[in-house]
């Protein structure tokens, strides 16, 4: 199997340009991770017209877009990830406290769905927990740090932080430490992804939990592309296998074996 790759620099307009280039090259299958949920209908129609199956990777597209325009999606269940983060947060806070939420990129399906899972669970099950702020850190460590510093200056007391990814959580940890507080103790922190740095923080006690969202999807992408090329049917949503990691589960051996 021959692989053609384009780096879109996290810009949807670059992704659309790359997809059109792949159409012009006459590739057999196109796989991409939508930066945001909206704006894909026209280019997906072009793929369909060209007879090229499309695999969505890691993130989905707006539910209002005709799902027949893509063939399958290989991704984590981001709503589930948000729900699991809420379950752990509720336990850590004993059902009562003030929580802030560090959102990912606005408009990204991972942002929307992780927030949905977390907020809906809290609303339905935890009347004593108040989510006082939702602010985007754009999935970056620097922005996570800056946003957390701003929230600490705005709110007199914060009990918990839910970060939509580990990078923002690691930035938030820095901001909390700079404010003279103990992350993981004074302020409980939960994030999503399960990267090596997050595992190290869990082991150190500065991060309470990370909900895994594995990026290691290449094997599934290649297997699915091969199946599509062979004319085989595939599931509409292929869910990746993820887990929840708290201090009782993270070991140095797991950290050493982490490749991302």
Regions found by a protein language model. Give the residues of each.
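Short, solvent-exposed amphipathic alpha-helices that sit
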Residues: 1, 81-85, 109-129, 143, ...
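Short beta-strand elements in bilobed, periplasmic/extracellular small-molecule ligand-binding domains
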Residues: 1-8, 98-101, 123-141
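Extracytoplasmic "Venus flytrap"
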Residues: 2-21, 25-27, 33-37, 103-113, ...
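Structural recognition of the beta-strand scaffold that forms the well-ordered cores
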Residues: 4-5, 29-33, 53-58, 73-75, ...
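Hydrophobic alpha-helical segments within soluble ligand-binding/sensing domains
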Residues: 15, 73-99, 143-145, 194-198, ...
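Hydrophobic alpha-helical
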Residues: 23-25, 29-49, 118, 132-200
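Flexible loop/hinge segments that line or gate small-molecule binding clefts
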Residues: 38, 42-80, 98, 104, ...
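Hinge/cleft segment of the Venus flytrap/periplasmic-binding protein
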Residues: 102, 106-110, 121-128, 132, ...
């Amino acid at each position: 199997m021959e692989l053609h790759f384009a780096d879109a620099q996290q810009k949807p307009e670059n992704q659309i340009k790359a997809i059109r280039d792949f159409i012009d090259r006459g590739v057999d299958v196109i796989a991409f991770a939508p930066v945001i949920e909206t704006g894909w209908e026209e280019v997906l129609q072009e793929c369909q017209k060209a007879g090229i199956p499309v695999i969505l990777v890691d993130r989905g597209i707006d539910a209002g877009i005709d799902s027949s325009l893509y063939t399958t999606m290989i991704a984590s269940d981001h709503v589930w990830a948000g729900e699991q983060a809420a379950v752990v947060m509720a336990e850590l806070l004993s059902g009562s406290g003030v929580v802030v939420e560090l959102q990912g990129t606005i408009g990204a399906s991972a942002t929307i769905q992780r927030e949905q899972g977390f907020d809906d669970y809290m609303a339905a099950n935890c009347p004593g927990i108040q989510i006082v702020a939702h602010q985007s850190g754009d999935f970056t460590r620097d922005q996570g740090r800056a946003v957390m510093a701003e929230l600490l200056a705005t709110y007199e007391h914060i009990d918990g932080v839910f970060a939509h990814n580990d990078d923002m959580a690691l930035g938030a940890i820095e901001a909390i430490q700079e404010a003279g507080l103990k992350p993981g103790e004074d302020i409980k922190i939960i994030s999503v992804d399960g990267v090596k740095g997050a595992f190290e923080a869990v082991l150190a006690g500065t991060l309470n939990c990370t909900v895994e969202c594995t990026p290691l999807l290449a094997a599934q992408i290649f297997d699915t592309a091969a199946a599509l090329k062979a004319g085989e049917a595939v599931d509409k949503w292929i869910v990746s296998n993820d887990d929840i990691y708290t201090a009782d589960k993270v070991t140095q051996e797991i950290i050493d074996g982490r490749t991302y």
